[in-house]
Regions:
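Alpha-helix capping/hinge segments and adjacent helical runs
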Residues: 1-48, 144-167, 171
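C-terminal amphipathic alpha-helical interaction region
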Residues: 37-40, 52-176
């Protein structure tokens, strides 16, 4: 067989060629997101996403247990929107898109935080003061994301907002 692992999941991953194609397109997807998708219809699609996230934040603010998480999503969204505007403030695509990959990573984290906030809101409402292990697990998983993953967006969006030139200025000749 040529594959000596005890568990087949690694072989399934390796044999599915599409996974490797997706891994190789991370940068392209970031360029597409920051360079095309958030600009579509004069930013209306991004505005719609922001409105929907804002609605969930408002609903979650109705629960005392979710105040910190609601504030974190609201702040994350605002940081993302500010970085988007800052990236395009000079209207120079080479400056705006130089850090498209960290933008993609941060954008994804904000969306996942939004989804976790909604899961947490539903869990708190369903528990209604009762102790339920399944719902407690949902809340704890959400809190993990808010405590360990969402804070990463600050660093990613800082280079986007500053239009940091480090990657853009790299030259192939420096590796010859």
């Amino acid at each position: 067989y040529g594959y000596t692992r005890d568990f087949p999941v690694e072989q399934y991953w390796r044999d599915n060629r599409l996974n490797m194609i997706h891994e190789g397109t991370h940068g392209i997807q970031g360029l597409d997101l920051l360079g095309r998708k958030v600009l579509m219809d004069d930013g209306k699609t991004l505005d719609l996403l922001a409105q929907r996230i804002g609605q969930t934040v408002q609903q979650a603010r109705g629960y005392a247990e979710l105040q910190a998480e609601s504030a974190a999503v609201a702040q994350g969204l605002q940081t993302l929107l500010d970085a988007t505007r800052a990236a395009w403030s000079t209207r120079q695509p080479d400056e705006a898109l130089a850090n498209a990959t960290p933008y993609l990573q941060a954008f994804g984290h904000v969306v996942v935080a939004w989804l976790w906030l909604d899961v947490a809101r539903v869990a708190v409402a369903a528990a209604a003061g009762q102790e339920d292990a399944f719902l407690r697990g949902k809340l704890q998983a959400a809190r993990y994301f808010f405590d360990f993953e969402l804070p990463k967006i600050a660093a990613w969006l800082a280079v986007v907002a500053a239009r940091n030139p480090t990657c853009r200025e790299m030259q192939d000749a420096w590796f010859e």
